[in-house]
């Protein structure tokens, strides 16, 4: 699916969810949505969704830092016209276990602090697996 088609699909899906009351608004008319990414594939796949959800939700975008490097991720934010993440969790540890533990710990603390109405992750990465553990 092209990025243009993804963009249209994301907007139409959100409109339908609102129309059929799958989403009930609060917080001044907007649900608080925490979106957590950690890798390039997650950023690319979620770009259209992130941009469209900002219209309908109070979105907080967090980056785990799993693969953070301007050449690996930062350039995609610019090219996909995404705002920089509001939160960098800086979770990289000395090994895989430490990194995953840091993602669980820091994403849990972020969820406790922000109290989002929903959390969105997409993918099969260590970031997604660990965030699910924190939820």
PLM regions with names:
Residues 34-37, 42-49, 76, 88-135:
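Active-site and donor-binding regions of nucleotide-sugar-utilizing enzymes
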Residues 58-99:
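Conserved nucleotide-sugar phosphate-binding/catalytic loop shared by glycosyltransferases and other
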Residues 7-66:
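N-terminal subdomain of nucleotide-sugar transferases
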Residues 1-2:
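Non-catalytic N-terminal targeting/anchoring module and adjacent flexible stem/linker
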